[in-house]
Amino acid sequence: FYDEYEQPTLATYKNQDGKLDTRFGTLPSFAKKTKTGYCFSDMVFDCWNNEAVYASAFGGNISISPMGSIDCDECQKHYSAFEIDESLFDEPNQSDYHSYNCNALASPYLNRKIADIKCDSRHIHCLIRNCTDAFERPEIETYNYVIIDRESDTRETFDFPDQSPDERRVGYGLRRMNDGSVTPYYISKKDAGITVTTVGPIS
C-alpha cells in the first residue's frame, strides 16, 4: 500500500457538475512506519491570490503551489511548521495490523497539530495546537502561532497570552484582513460575555 499506490489526502471538484477534478496531497511520512494509514491524515488548506497552501496537520509538512497546477509536484514549494523525530515511533507487531493498537503506539508522539493555516505574499501562517488528547479543548490546551518566511524559509514561533483567572478560552484562529494580511486571535468567555482578542498583526 505505502510503496505501490498513491495516497492522496485532498481533492477538488468541478463547480459545473460536482465531479471529481483533482486529487493531491499525501499521507504523513510516519504513516508507513507506524502502519496508521489514513488515521492521522488530517489536512488544512487555504487559497489566497490564486495560490493554494496545504499541510499535513500531524506531520507538519506544508506545500504551496499555484491553484492551476495544484497536483504538479514540480510546481510546489515545501516548508515545515515543525519536525517529528520518526525514530521515536515503535514499529507495530503484525498482529496489531488492522487494529487501533497501531494508533495507540503512535499517538503519544503526535502532540502537535496544525489547526489552521493561511498564506500571504510573504509568509505562511500556522496555528499550532499542543494536543492533550484526541479532543480539542481550548480551555486546557495551549496554542502557538508559527509564521514562516516564504523567501528565507525561516520560522518564528509565538505564544498566546496566558489565561487570566476569570477567563475561559473557547477558541483560537487565524483571520484574514481585507488587505490580505493575517492576524491570529483567541476567543474568551468571561462573566461579562464573550470577547475576541487579536494578537498582532506581526509583520
Model-predicted segments: where are they?
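Repeated scaffold domains used in trafficking and secretory/extracellular systems
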Residues: F40-V44, R112-I117, P165-M177
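Loop-centered beta-sheet repeat module
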Residues: E4-S65
